[in-house]
C-alpha cells in the first residue's frame, strides 16, 4: 500500500557489492518418507522348505505386509501430504501443522554491519525474537499462495469486483478468519483492501459496491494487497499485464525494488535508498504505440515502515534521490515499493474514494450524527487501525453509512485514502516487498519464486 510524501533533492550512488542470498520457498517443507517393502526374492527365500508349512509361512508373510501398507496409507493423510486447492481454500495451518513456515529471502548485512552475521550477542537476540517472525512468515506464505493463484487466474473480461473478492476470500480462507464476527478480522485476515489500480491510476483503487469496471487485454493493473496475522502485516504488490509490450515497464519496477532492498539495512539513510532506486528505474524505457517512452519514478509515492496493526509507520522510503537523512534501525519492518510511469511521474488524488483507516492519533470529538457514532464503534471493534473499504462495511451489514463515514473523515477520526493517479493516457506499474531488519540479517519476508 502506497505512502505519499513530498520529494527532496540529493544524488547518491548505488552500491553493487551486495551478494544475492537464497530465495525462500512457498511450499510445505514436510514430506512423507518412502517405506521399503519386502522383495519377492525375500519371500521366496523364506519359503525354501517344501509342503504345507512352507506355503502357510508364505501366506502369513503376505498377510503381515498388508496391514503395514494400510497403516502407511493412513499416515499419508497427514498435513504434510496436503496441497493447496484452486482457488486456495486449505487452511495454511493444515499445510504447516507445527507453525514452521518458510523463511523469506535471507540477506547478509554488508560493510560495517557484516559482523552481525556471526556476532554471538546478535545471534542471541535473533533467537529471542522468533515469535513475531512466525506471524510474519505465516502471513507471507499466505500472500505467496494467494498471489500465485491470482496471477494465473486473472484474465481479461473479469470485473474488478470479482478479482478483489476472489483474492480476499482466499486470504480469509487460508487464515481461518472470515471477519464476520466482532473482532475476528483483527486476529488475522486482510491487512488492507485489495488494490486494483489500472493504467494511469497508480494506487489506492478498489471497487466500491456496484462497480462494473472490467479489466481489458491492453490494461496495466497493479495488484496490491496485505495479509496480517495478529497485526503483523505483510505488504506486497505486483503488476499484472496481458500484452508483452508493457514488459519493460514492469521489469523496471521489479529491478528498482530489488535495488532498494539491496541498499536497505541497519543505519542506512533513506536518501541512499531513494538514489539507488531512481538510478535503476530511470535506466529503462518502453516502446508503446511506436513511441519510445522513458520510465520515470513517481516521485511523490514512497515505501514505508510498518507498525503493529499500522500499515504506514512513522518512516517513509523515497524512490528518488533526496536529502532525507533518516536511518533504518534494527528491528524495524519496511515495505519497499516502487512505481514507474510513462507520464509526469507525479500523482494526484482522483476518482471515488474507497480506502479508509481509523487514525491511531484520532482526536476525541463529540459526534452529533448518530450514524457516525455507531459506525465508529463498528470500525473500532472490527478493524481497529487496519485499513478497510466500503465493501467491507457492506459485508458487515452496514447500510446507508456514507453520511456517517464522511462525518468521521471530516472530524479527523478516520483518514480517507483516495486513488492516486498520474495524467490520463499514461501507464504506471508497481513492485513491492516487505522485509524485517533482524539483528543478524535482513529477511525479505514476501519473496517468492514468482518475484
Swiss-Prot record:
Enzyme class: hydrolase
Free-text comment on the cofactor: Binds 2 divalent metal cations per subunit. Has a high-affinity and a low affinity metal-binding site. The true nature of the physiological cofactor is under debate. The enzyme is active with cobalt, zinc, manganese or divalent iron ions. Most likely, methionine aminopeptidases function as mononuclear Fe(2+)-metalloproteases under physiological conditions, and the catalytically relevant metal-binding site has been assigned to the histidine-containing high-affinity site.
Compositionally biased tracts (Polar residues): 19-28
Binding locations of a divalent metal cation 2: 235, 304, 337, 432
The EC number(s) this enzyme carries: 3.4.11.18
Gene Ontology annotations of biological process type: proteolysis
SUPFAM superfamilies registered for this protein in UniProt: Creatinase/aminopeptidase, Winged helix' DNA-binding domain
This protein's name: Methionine aminopeptidase 2-2
TM segment ranges: none
GO molecular function: initiator methionyl aminopeptidase activity; metal ion binding; metalloaminopeptidase activity
Assigned keywords, A-Z: Aminopeptidase, Cytoplasm, Hydrolase, Metal-binding, Protease
Amino acid at each position: 500500500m502506497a505512502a505519499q510524501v513530498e520529494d527532496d533533492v540529493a544524488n547518491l550512488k548505488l552500491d553493487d557489492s551486495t551478494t544475492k542470498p537464497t530465495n525462500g520457498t512457498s511450499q510445505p517443507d514436510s514430506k512423507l518418507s518412502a517405506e521399503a517393502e519386502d522383495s519377492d526374492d525375500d519371500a521366496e527365500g523364506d519359503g525354501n522348505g517344501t509342503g504345507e508349512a512352507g506355503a502357510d509361512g508364505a501366506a502369513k508373510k503376505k498377510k503381515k505386509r498388508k496391514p503395514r501398507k494400510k497403516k502407511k496409507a493412513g499416515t499419508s493423510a497427514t498435513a504434510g501430504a496436503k496441497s493447496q486447492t484452486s482457488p486456495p481454500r486449505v487452511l495454511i495451518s493444515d499445510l504447516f501443522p507445527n507453525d514452521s513456515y518458510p523463511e523469506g529471502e535471507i540477506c547478509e548485512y554488508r560493510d560495517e554491519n557484516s559482523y552481525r552475521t556471526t556476532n554471538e550477542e546478535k545471534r542471541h537476540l535473533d533467537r529471542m525474537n522468533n515469535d513475531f517472525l512466525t506471524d510474519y512468515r505465516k502471513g507471507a506464505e499466505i500472500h505467496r499462495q494467494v498471489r500465485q493463484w491470482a496471477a494465473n487466474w486473472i484474465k481479461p473480461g473479469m470485473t474488478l469486483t470479482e478479482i478483489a473478492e476472489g483474492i480476499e476470500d482466499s486470504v480469509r480462507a487460508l487464515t481461518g478468519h472470515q471477519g464476520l464476527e466482532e473482532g475476528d478480522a483483527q486476529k488475522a485476515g486482510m491487512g488492507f483492501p485489495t488494490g486494483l489500480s489500472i493504467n494511469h491510476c497508480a494506487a489506492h483503487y478498489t471497487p466500491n459496491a456496484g462497480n462494473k469496471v472490467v479489466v481489458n487485454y491492453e490494461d496495466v493493473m497493479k495488484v496490491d494487497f496485505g495479509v496480517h496475522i495478529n497485526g503483523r502485516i505483510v505488504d506486497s504488490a505486483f503488476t499484472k499485464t496481458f500484452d508483452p509490450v508493457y514488459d519493460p515497464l514492469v521489469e523496471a519496477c521489479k529491478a528498482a525494488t530489488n535495488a532498494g532492498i539491496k541498499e536497505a539495512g541497519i543505519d542506512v539513510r533513506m536518501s541512499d535508498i531513494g538514489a539507488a532506486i531512481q538510478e535503476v528505474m530511470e535506466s529503462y524505457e518502453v516502446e508503446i504505440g511506436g513511441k519510445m517512452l522513458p520510465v520515470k519514478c513517481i516521485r511523490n509515492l514512497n515505501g514505508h515502515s510498518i507498525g503493529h496493526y499500522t500499515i504506514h509507520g512513522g518512516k517513509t522510503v523515497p524512490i528518488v534521490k533526496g536529502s532525507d537523512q533518516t536511518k533504518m534501525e534494527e528491528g524495524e519492518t519496511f515495505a519497499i515499493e516502487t512505481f514507474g510511469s510513462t507520464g509526469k511521474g507525479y500523482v494526484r488524488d482522483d476518482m471515488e474514494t474507497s480506502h479508509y483507516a481509523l487514525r491511531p492519533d484520532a482526536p476525541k470529538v463529540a459526534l452529533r450524527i448518530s450514524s457516525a457514532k455507531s459506525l465508529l464503534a463498528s470500525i473500532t471493534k472490527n478493524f481497529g487501525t487496519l485499513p478497510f473499504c466500503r465493501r467491507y462495511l457492506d459485508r458487515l451489514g452496514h447500510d446507508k453509512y456514507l453520511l456517517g463515514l464522511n462525518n468521521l473523515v471530516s472530524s479527523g477520526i478516520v483518514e480517507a485514502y483516495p486513488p492516486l493517479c498520474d495524467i490520463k493516457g499514461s501507464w504506471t506499474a508497481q513492485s513491492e516487498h516487505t522485509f524485517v531488519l533482524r539483528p543478524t540479517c535482513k529477511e525479505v519476508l514476501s519473496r517468492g519464486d514468482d518475484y
